[in-house]
């Protein structure tokens, strides 16, 4: 009972901290709950713990694993990892398309949060967002080519100028214009001052 009570107190603070992180990541209406149920007694106690969320006011929280989209799961994981980053022993975090279904403003916040987490843990992020990619210390371009009946994937580390061109390409359209290149440069200047 003491262990359960201690966990519940910690869980309340943890849930409040996660909610703050998710509000920052443009999920302002989310309700995040740590749910406790009695399980089978083991060496780690009797508690069976599950994360529940409701993305909209008035909805009852439901199991995170069942209702969250891929983009929501990535942002929730990022929020949790940003809280645990200083105590976590994970060497590398991988986020695949964390930008799915989010606005440019949310992408910028996600990029900043990823940069913050990367101070303590290596972060690999696959993204289609210039706002997120512009925060990276190192930028790789992944491309697929079909030759005959085979598909080949290539990975290339981008130079500073190639990076600016790639950010402009991500931002926009069939032709890279001077305005897009200037916007890409501004993102890099804002994030790195160079």
Regions found by a protein language model. Give the residues of each.
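Charged, surface-exposed helical/loop "interaction arms" that form contiguous linear patches used
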Residues: 1-40
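Flexible glycine-/small-residue-rich
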Residues: 34-38, 53-57, 80-82, 143-144, ...
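C-terminal lobe/lid and adjacent interdomain/linker elements of RecA-like ASCE P-loop ATPase modules
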Residues: 49, 105-194
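GG-anchored amphipathic helix commonly corresponding to the ABC/SMC/Rad50 NBD signature/C-loop
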Residues: 51, 55-58, 73-93
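Conserved D-loop-proximal element of ABC-family nucleotide-binding domains
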Residues: 87-88, 100-108
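Walker B catalytic acidic pair
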Residues: 96-97
